[in-house]
Amino acid sequence: MSKLKITNARRKQRVRLSLRRIANGRPRLSVFRSSKHIYAQVIDDLKGETLASASSLEKAMRDAGNTGADIDAAKAVGKLVAERAVKNGVKEVVFDRGGYLYHGRVKALADAARESGLSF
């Protein structure tokens, strides 16, 4: 394994461990970003269920013109996943950045989710 992959894997483990410690039964808002798209889902780890999800691949995003993995798409995904989570009765979550730095697309998604009603 390359040094970069090891560093990223360790960061991801460290983030997940700290999330488990502070979660207190709250679901987590998990973010995955690729070079072409961005994905977010609200996961209840106690039940093992996904409560809400959104990605830049969805038809609603394509119709609005927010495709790809830029900051505008991340904002739209954050807003959409927050609206779906609030609709399912989830108000408080723990933000799981998944080892990614809290900057750029990840930060834009988090800010949009906060503005749309999720608190973390």
UniProtKB/Swiss-Prot annotation:
GO terms for cellular component: cytosolic large ribosomal subunit. GO terms for molecular function: 5S rRNA binding; structural constituent of ribosome. CDD domains: Ribosomal_L18_L5e (cd00432). SUPFAM superfamilies: Translational machinery components (SSF53137). InterPro entries: Ribosomal_uL18_bac-type, Ribosomal_uL18_bac/euk. Gene3D superfamilies: 3.30.420.100. Keywords: Ribonucleoprotein, Ribosomal protein, RNA-binding, rRNA-binding. It comes from the Bacteria. This is one of the proteins that bind and probably mediate the attachment of the 5S RNA into the large ribosomal subunit, where it forms part of the central protuberance. Belongs to the universal ribosomal protein uL18 family. Part of the 50S ribosomal subunit; part of the 5S rRNA/L5/L18/L25 subcomplex. Contacts the 5S and 23S rRNAs. PANTHER family: 39S RIBOSOMAL PROTEIN L18, MITOCHONDRIAL (PTHR12899), LARGE RIBOSOMAL SUBUNIT PROTEIN UL18M (PTHR12899:SF3). This is Large ribosomal subunit protein uL18.
